Amino acid sequence: MKNSIFIIVLLLVHMATFAQEGVNFEDLTFDEALAKAKAENKFVFVDCYTSWCGPCKYMAQAVFPQKSMGDFFNPRFVSVKFDMERGEGKELNEKFGVKAYPTFLILRPDGTLQHKIVGGTGMIEMFIEKVERGLNEKTSLDYLDKKYEKGKLNKKELVRY
């Protein structure tokens, strides 16, 4: 009996440890996430999802819990999730023009948009690559938008845009 209890406790501890290895999504309001990002000198990563979105559920269950995702995201971001059809998510949906799900926003601590990724993927390396592109000032959506408005995108940038 004692062995059984010990094994169960050991398994629960192992499962809890595994669950913490992925992306640490925090239960914060939008303003709290911005304040925390500013205090920690990080970006804000926003997972924009809906309750009925299959790819959103896949990202939440199979991609974000992966250790490699946590290793990449947790030092760089304050990560939060918002249902775009409920509560504060409705306001964010309108503010950032989210039209498809999942959409992922990379925001500066002042709340301005640095980058937007539309659509999920099961390929972790590919997703991290997209996020890295968004963190780079010269390849982020914000940078490309500004260059586009000035009519200064080269062919390679135009394809990426």
Where are the regions that the model predicts?
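Short cysteine clusters
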Residues: 53-56
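Thiol-based oxidoreductase modules, predominantly thioredoxin-like and allied folds used
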Residues: 22-28, 48-50, 62-89, 98, ...
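Bacterial Sec-dependent N-terminal signal peptides
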Residues: 1-22
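Non-catalytic, surface beta->alpha helical segment in thiol-disulfide oxidoreductase systems
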Residues: 98-140
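Short active-site neighborhood of thiol/selenol oxidoreductases, capturing the structured segment around
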Residues: 40-51
